[in-house]
Amino acid sequence: MKTVTLSRLNAFKHAQEPFSCLTAYDASFAQHADAAGIDVLLVGDSLGMVLQGHASTLPVTLDDILYHTRCVARGKQRSLLMVDLPFMSNADTGQLLRDAGALMRAGAELVKIEGAGWMHEGVRELTRRGVPVCAHLGLTPQSVHQFGGYKVQGREQDDAQRIIDDARLLVEAGASVILLECVPAALGRAVRDAVDVPVIGIGAGPEVDGQILVMHDVIGVTHGRPPRFAKNFLAGRDSIQAAFEAYRDAVKTRQFPAEEHCF
């Protein structure tokens, strides 16, 4: 299988071929996901919840992210490696550049930033310096307290238009990828059509360019009630590898997400 690059993700978009993405936090699971043909691996600050047991992603530090990035970078071969900037890494431009540079040195190939249109100057500064950026819009978990919980975003027309406008602004500033979380399926489609870069969705409907899930949801080990957009692909299968392959195939054939996974 070919190595996945940003150019390849763009080719997937233009060919209308959905691509699969999955979180990974260590070398072993990265090897399994890579071998299963998962196109993008994300070292997400979700590790704060699924690995460290926190109630949110806010306590995750840059050192935490760097440790897991190095682990995943050693385990993967062909998948593109995307990595989260932790909470408040974008407090000012200097810190943003330093933290993003540290992630790239650790093995990141795409740096993900949560926020909204106000990030455009930071995105511009990063891309000027050769750091590829994924802009995370919609439900941004680092803003959970501002949102008042993990709630679907963009239900109202004004909010939906703001997200579309933010996506356009951030792509104009240089963002290479947009990630949409927990928005109505119609908004996912609208953002996909509004920008010429790949749009990855998690709870954003079936008509975005790629899908991402947290690995723990895919193999059914999430504590408590799983999110609506998740599916246990290990159920009825005998290995984690088979679960990852089933997820990949379901995304490629547009069988996932189904209507019950959408807002």
UniProtKB/Swiss-Prot annotation:
Principal location class: cytoplasm
Residues binding 3-methyl-2-oxobutanoate: 45-46, 84, 112
Pathway membership, UniProt: Cofactor biosynthesis; (R)-pantothenate biosynthesis; (R)-pantoate from 3-methyl-2-oxobutanoate: step 1/2
Listed InterPro entries: Pantoate_hydroxy_MeTrfase, Pyrv/PenolPyrv_kinase-like_dom, Pyrv_kinase-like_dom_sf
Signal sequence region: none
Coiled-coil intervals: none
Subunit composition and interactions: Homodecamer; pentamer of dimers.
Name used for this protein in its record: 3-methyl-2-oxobutanoate hydroxymethyltransferase
